C-alpha cells in the first residue's frame, strides 16, 4: 500500500510546482509513568505561524514516509503509540489551494483525493494506538488527520477549528464527511460541516471541539503537549478510559441530513452543489462502510475541483485573504498622521456604532456631538451598554471596561469636543446641505491637521467639501450595516483629497480591522450602485407587471444571502428610495425611481412583507398600493434582464475607473453585501454563465482566473 501511495503522490507532486512543503518530523519520547517509548510526528512547513501548514502532494508524501517509519517501529515493538501534532499555534489547515486551482483534469483531481485518503487512513491501521494533539488552528485536512487517529486532545487556546470546505465549494474530502458523523453523530456533524460553513465559515474554539465529542480531552495551552503526553500514558496504561456515546443510526440520522438540506436551501437555494454533495455522503455514512464513503468523497472532490463554483470560491478566498491586505491604489502608509482622538458628529444609531468601533479598536478618546443633550446622552449610553455586554460575555475584563467607558464622552459644543481631535467623522442625515453645514462648523474648530471623514452612502465627497477652506482633508469613509459584522470600508477619494488624508484613512481602517477598498468619488460608490441597479431591475419588472413572487424567485439560483425585497427591508425602503433618486439624477437612462417603492415609503411601510406565519408574505396593504402594468416575464427572463443590467453597470464602472479592477468590485460585494464565495463576488459568475459576453461583449476576468484553466 505504501509504495502505491508513494507513486501516486510522486505523480501528483508535479501538478503543484509552487507547493510550500510540510515536513513530518519523527522524534521519540519516553512517556511518563513508564508507559513506554512513543513516536511523535510534528507537521511543520518551516515558516512562522502567519504561514499555516498545508498539505499538497509533496507534503502528503512526507507524512507517508513518516508513517512508513513508525509503522515499522510499531510492528517490531519498538514503540507503544504514535502522536501527531503541529508547529507552534498551528496544527494544519488543510489542502494547498494554490495547487488545487492549477488542476486541469478530472483524473488529476481524483488523484489528490485518493492520495490524502491513502496516507491518512494508514494512521488508523497501525499496530499501536494513534493520537492527534490539536495544539493550534486546525481546518479541513488538518482536522481530518486527527479524525483518522484513535484518540484526540485539544488545546483550550486553539483559536480556530473547522471543516470549511463547503464554504469554498468543496466537500471535506479526506474523511470528514464519513468519520465525523460516525464519531459524534450526524446532527453534530451537519452543524460542523454544513451549518458552520454556510454561516460565514464559523470557527470552533478548543472547548467547543471537546464539548462536541471530537476531542477526548481538553488541556490548557501553556503546557498542552506535556499534559497530552501524560494523558496518553494514562490511556496506554489503562488508567484512563475514553467512553464515547453510541451514535444514533436510526431516524435521527435522516432527520439530521434533512436539517442540513433545509440549511443549504435557505443559504444557497440549490445554487452551489458542494453542500448537497456533502450531505449525500453524510447520509450514506450511516452504513458505517468507511471505504465506500472515502470513495464517494474522492469522486465528489474531483467533480467539484473541476467545477466553476470552487474556482470562484478560491478566487474569493484569495481576494479576502490577500488583496484585502494590499489595497489597490493606497498611498504610502508613511504619509499617515497619528490618530490620538476621534470625534463623531451625530449620536444616532449609526454614529453610536461607529463610536463604539473606534473606541474598541483604537482605544483612544472618542467624543460624540449632536443637536441636544438628550441625543448625546443616548449615544454615550448606547456605547456604555455595549461595553457592559462585552464584559458580561467575558470578552473584556472589568479594568478594560472601566477604561473604555472613561474614554468615551459627549458634548454639545463642537469647539469643546473637537479642538484637539485628529480624525472626525460625520454620520448625520443623508442630505448634502446638512453635511456641508456640519463640515463647515467642524472645520472652524478642528485643528489644521485633522482629517474630516464622511460616512455618506451615496453623496459626492467633492461637493460636500467644495465650500471648505481645506477640501484636501475630506475623505469618504463608508461603513456597511451592521458595522460590527460587515468588514467592508469604501474609502472614497474626492477631487481634492490629498495623499496624507487618504493614507490616514487607510491606516485607521487597518486598525479598525476593516477591508478597505479605494473608490473614486462617483454616485453611490461601488456596493450601493450595483445593488441599486440590481434591485432597480427587480422593481422595474414588478412595476411593469411581473408578480412579486416570480421576480423574487428569479434570482434564487444565485444563492444570495437574502432576496432583493428582504434586503430592501433590511436597508430600509426610504434609504433605498434615496439612493435610487441619487443615481437617477446621475444616470437617468439606467436608474429609475420606482413609483411603487415611492408609494411604499410614503405609506410608512417598513417593507413589502409581513411575517405572520414566520415566512415572508406580501403585505396586503402593500399589495393594494402596487400599480402594475401588464407585461409578465418568466423567471428566466427576469434573471437574464437583471444580470445583464448588473454586468453592464460593472463594465461602465470599470470604464469610469471607479475602482482599479474587477477584483475590487468582487471584494466589495463579498465583504460589503455578503455575496457568496461560490459567485466569487459576481464577475466570475457572470463570466461562467456567459452573461459578461452577452451583455458587454467580453469577459471581466481572463480565462483561467476564477475558472478551470484551458
State where each predicted segment sits.
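Amphipathic alpha-helical interaction surfaces in cytosolic regulatory modules
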Residues: 63, 75, 88-102, 108, ...
Amino acid at each position: 500500500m505504501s509504495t502505491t501511495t508513494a507513486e501516486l503522490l510522486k505523480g501528483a507532486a508535479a501538478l503543484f510546482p509552487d507547493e510550500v512543503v510540510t515536513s513530518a518530523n519523527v522524534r521519540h519520547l519516553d512517556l511518563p509513568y513508564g508507559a513506554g517509548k512513543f513516536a511523535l510526528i510534528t507537521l511543520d512547513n518551516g515558516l512562522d505561524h502567519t504561514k499555516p501548514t498545508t498539505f499538497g502532494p509533496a507534503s502528503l508524501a512526507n507524512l507517508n514516509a513518516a508513517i512508513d517509519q513508525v509503522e515499522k517501529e510499531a510492528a517490531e515493538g519498538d514503540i507503544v503509540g504514535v502522536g501527531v501534532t503541529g508547529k507552534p499555534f498551528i496544527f494544519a489547515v488543510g489542502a494547498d489551494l494554490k495547487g488545487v486551482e492549477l488542476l486541469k483534469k478530472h483524473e488529476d483531481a481524483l488523484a489528490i483525493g485518493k492520495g490524502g485518503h491513502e496516507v491518512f487512513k494508514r494512521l488508523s491501521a497501525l499496530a499501536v494506538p494513534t493520537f492527534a494533539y490539536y495544539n493550534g488552528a486546525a481546518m479541513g485536512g488538518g482536522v481530518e488527520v486527527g479524525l483518522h487517529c484513535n484518540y484526540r486532545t485539544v488545546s483550550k487556546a486553539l483559536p480556530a477549528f473547522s471543516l470549511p470546505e463547503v464554504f469554498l465549494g468543496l466537500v471535506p474530502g479526506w474523511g470528514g464527511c464519513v468519520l465525523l458523523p460516525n464519531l459524534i453523530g450526524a446532527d453534530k456533524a451537519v452543524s460542523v460541516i454544513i451549518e458552520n460553513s454556510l454561516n460565514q465559515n464559523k470557527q470552533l474554539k478548543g472547548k467547543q471541539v471537546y464539548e462536541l465529542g471530537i476531542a477526548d480531552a481538553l488541556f490548557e495551552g501553556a503546557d498542552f503537549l506535556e499534559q497530552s503526553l501524560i494523558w496518553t500514558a494514562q490511556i496506554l496504561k489503562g488508567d484512563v478510559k475514553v467512553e464515547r456515546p453510541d451514535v444514533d443510526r436510526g431516524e435521527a440520522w435522516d432527520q439530521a441530513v434533512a436539517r442540513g438540506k433545509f440549511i443549504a436551501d435557505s443559504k444557497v437555494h440549490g445554487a452551489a452543489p458542494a453542500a448537497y454533495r456533502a450531505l449525500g455522503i453524510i447520509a450514506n455514512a450511516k452504513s458505517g462502510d468507511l471505504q465506500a464513503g472515502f470513495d464517494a468523497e474522492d469522486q465528489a472532490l474531483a467533480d467539484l475541483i473541476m467545477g466553476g463554483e470552487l474556482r470562484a470560491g478560491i478566487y474569493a478566498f484569495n481576494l479576502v485573504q490577500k488583496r484585502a491586505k494590499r489595497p489597490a491604489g493606497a498611498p504610502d502608509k508613511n504619509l499617515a498622521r497619528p490618530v490620538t482622538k476621534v470625534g463623531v458628529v451625530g449620536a444616532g444609531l449609526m454614529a453610536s456604532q461607529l463610536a463604539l468601533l473606534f473606541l474598541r479598536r483604537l482605544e483612544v478618546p472618542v467624543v460624540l456631538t449632536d443637536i441636544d443633550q438628550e441625543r448625546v446622552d443616548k449615544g454615550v449610553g448606547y456605547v456604555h451598554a455595549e461595553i457592559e455586554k462585552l464584559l458580561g460575555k467575558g470578552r473584556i475584563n472589568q479594568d478594560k471596561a472601566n477604561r473604555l467607558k472613561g474614554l468615551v464622552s459627549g458634548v454639545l459644543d463642537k469647539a469643546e469636543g473637537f479642538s484637539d481631535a485628529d480624525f472626525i467623522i460625520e454620520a448625520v442625515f443623508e442630505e448634502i446641505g446638512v453635511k456641508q453645514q456640519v463640515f463647515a462648523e467642524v472645520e472652524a474648530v478642528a485643528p489644521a491637521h485633522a482629517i474630516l471623514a464622511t460616512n455618506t452612502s451615496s453623496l459626492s465627497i467633492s461637493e460636500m467639501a467644495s465650500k471648505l477652506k481645506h477640501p484636501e482633508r475630506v475623505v469618504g469613509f463608508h461603513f456597511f450595516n451592521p458595522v460590527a459584522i460587515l468588514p467592508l470600508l469604501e474609502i472614497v477619494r474626492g477631487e481634492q483629497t490629498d495623499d496624507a488624508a487618504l493614507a490616514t484613512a487607510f491606516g485607521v481602517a487597518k486598525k479598525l480591522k476593516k477591508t478597505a477598498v479605494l473608490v473614486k468619488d462617483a454616485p453611490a460608490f461601488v456596493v450601493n450602485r450595483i445593488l441599486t441597479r440590481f434591485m432597480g431591475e427587480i422593481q422595474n419588472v414588478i412595476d411593469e407587471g411581473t408578480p412579486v413572487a416570480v421576480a423574487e424567485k428569479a434570482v434564487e439560483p444565485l444563492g444570495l444571502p437574502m432576496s432583493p425585497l428582504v434586503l430592501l427591508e433590511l436597508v430600509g425602503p426610504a434609504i433605498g428610495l434615496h439612493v435610487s433618486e441619487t443615481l437617477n439624477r446621475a444616470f437617468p437612462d439606467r436608474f429609475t425611481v420606482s413609483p411603487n417603492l415611492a408609494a411604499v415609503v410614503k405609506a410608512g411601510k417598513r417593507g413589502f412583507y409581513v411575517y405572520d406565519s414566520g415566512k415572508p408574505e406580501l403585505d396586503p396593504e402593500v399589495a393594494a398600493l402596487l400599480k402594475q402594468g401588464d407585461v409578465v416575464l418568466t423567471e428566466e427572463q427576469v434573471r437574464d434582464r437583471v444580470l445583464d443590467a448588473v454586468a453592464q453597470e460593472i463594465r461602465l464602472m470599470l470604464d469610469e475607473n471607479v475602482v482599479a479592477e474587477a477584483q475590487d468590485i468582487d471584494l466589495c460585494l463579498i465583504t460589503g453585501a455578503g455575496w457568496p464565495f461560490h459567485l466569487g463576488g459576481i464577475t466570475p459568475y457572470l463570466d461562467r454563465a456567459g452573461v459578461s459576453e452577452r451583455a458587454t461583449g467580453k469577459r471581466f476576468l481572463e480565462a483561467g482566473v476564477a475558472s478551470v484553466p484551458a
